[in-house]
Amino acid sequence: NVGGGLGINYDDPNGQPIPNFKEYFDTYAQHLVLREGQQLHFELGRAVVGQCGALITRTLYVKQGTYKQFAIVDAGMTDLIRPALYQATHKIENISSDEPCEVYDVVGPICESSDVFAKSIEINKCHRGDLIALRSAGAYGEIMASQYNCRQLPKGYVTEDL
């Protein structure tokens, strides 16, 4: 066991090339001598599929608070728990708007204070109905989803248009 898989760049999903796995494995082959019958196992994880998925959610409401502005979306921590579970960050984009950016807290509809995808981020101005993409959700998004609070599991779709 040589540890966990290769990481990904959550801040710039389009800027990360597909890893050169041959080069990666060759490094181990040069430095590890296996005895007869031994095997080497890798967990490739996020490097293979992390950038292949995005959570697409719809803006339910835009709420102007006293000190901040909220974009409340229909996805919640049940659909992508990484931000709530260990403060993971995902690039978030309003894919319905070309308007100038504004600062939002992007939150889900679940009655939990941890149902937050991001705080104080700049994204294109949000309106009710806008589609919001949480990028880099391909590795552990769907598999870690839950039906907490009677919510349905997210559905997966395949597209090349994002």
Where are these regions (language model features)?
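Charged (often Lys/Glu-rich) extended helix/loop segments that serve as interaction or gating elements
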Residues: Q38-L162
